[in-house]
């Protein structure tokens, strides 16, 4: 793929192994490209079929990508589908790493799930959004709070439960916040947790 752009069409990027790895879109194709600090392409790692996606996790020589309704593992420039949503309109939006485990959150039509893997190949469904509140539509985010040693998940759209936490890595969840405000991102700090707002007050709020 030829990148003749002043600003490459980068969907998202991560820093791994001292390099900038970016998910780049051109026409109807995606690719993972390695860039230098000036955002000049050094090499292309792999080309993928799709028009939207995210780099969810990067560690050593493995990349975990969300492309359409699939989780794709890229290793040694080879790609494989490791998980697929039960609904074609859904996608995997965020991931968080806790020691040797990676947790991924699904977004889209109800119900959506949180999945976990230790090797990025075999995935186990931990919980569905409707297991935690039958009126919820989907999860918005999952992150690990290193200060409080707990997983934090935001979700909603149709219910008053907006934030949940788990102290046993996703098997048992409790509400952290119920109310009108709906969030996407959660950033844990030592003495507080900062939440990024959703687009507005959703139904149920």
Predicted regions and their residues:
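Asp-box/BNR beta-propeller loop motif
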Residues: 35-42, 76-80, 115-125, 165-174
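Structural motif
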Residues: 28-33, 69-73, 110-116, 159-165, ...
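Repeated scaffold domains used in trafficking and secretory/extracellular systems
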Residues: 7-17, 48-60, 87-97, 135-141, ...
């Amino acid at each position: 793929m030829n990148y003749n752009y002043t600003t490459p069409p980068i969907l998202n990027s991560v820093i791994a192994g001292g390099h900038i790895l970016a998910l780049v879109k051109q026409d109807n194709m995606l690719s993972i490209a390695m860039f230098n600090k000036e955002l000049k392409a050094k090499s292309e790692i792999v080309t993928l079929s799709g028009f939207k996606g995210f780099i969810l996790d990067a560690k050593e020589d493995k990349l975990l990508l969300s492309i359409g309704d699939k989780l794709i593992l890229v290793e040694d420039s080879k790609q494989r589908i490791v998980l697929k949503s039960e609904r074609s309109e859904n996608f995997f939006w965020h991931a968080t790493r806790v020691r040797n485990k990676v947790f991924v959150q699904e977004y889209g039509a109800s119900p959506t799930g949180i999945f976990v893997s230790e090797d990025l190949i075999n995935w186990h469904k931990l919980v569905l959004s409707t297991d935690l509140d039958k009126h919820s539509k989907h999860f918005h985010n999952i992150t690990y709070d290193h200060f409080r040693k707990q997983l934090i998940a935001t979700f909603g759209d149709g219910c008053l439960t907006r934030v949940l936490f788990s102290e046993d890595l996703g098997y048992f969840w409790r509400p952290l916040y119920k109310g009108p405000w709906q969030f996407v991102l959660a950033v844990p700090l030592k003495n507080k947790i900062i939440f990024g707002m959703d687009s507005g007050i959703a139904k149920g709020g």
